[in-house]
């Protein structure tokens, strides 16, 4: 009886790893051992950066809001406080979009918050 060497499973496992490493440079896309470690590392970076992306976007939104609010003679922190006291429930993502794409609407919101309550 011939010896079974698990050929198809072995080949499929390698093929799967090399498919994930497609587009990597040099041996990282051709050689199984280096491709395997490159795919593992890429997965770690992807996992880390999916979490990092959330804080990066929040920073971007705050920067955009701050720039737009300062054009109207107000600081970011005072603007956010005024929004809370006036009961305007808009999140930073929406405010940043308004500041970036719909300036006149954003300016109207800023003017509304400037009015004393």
Swiss-Prot record:
- GO BP term, example: ribosomal large subunit assembly
Gene of origin? rplT
What organism does the record attribute this protein to?
Answer: Leptospira biflexa serovar Patoc (strain Patoc 1 / ATCC 23582 / Paris)
The answer to whether the entry has keyword Phosphoprotein is: no
Q: What is this protein called?
A: Large ribosomal subunit protein bL20
> Pfam families given for it?
Ribosomal_L20
Which key words are in the record? Ribonucleoprotein, Ribosomal protein, RNA-binding, rRNA-binding
| InterPro entries linked to this entry | Ribosomal_bL20, RIBOSOMAL_L20_CS, Ribosomal_protein_bL20_C
Q: Which family does it belong to?
A: Belongs to the bacterial ribosomal protein bL20 family.
Mind giving the lineage of the organism this protein is from? Bacteria, Pseudomonadati, Spirochaetota, Spirochaetia, Leptospirales
Example GO molecular function: structural constituent of ribosome
> What is the protein's known function?
Binds directly to 23S ribosomal RNA and is necessary for the in vitro assembly process of the 50S ribosomal subunit. It is not involved in the protein synthesizing functions of that subunit.
Is Hydrolase there in the keyword field?
A: no
> What HAMAP family does this protein's entry cite?
Ribosomal_bL20 (MF_00382)
What NCBIfam families does this protein's entry cite?
A: rplT_bact
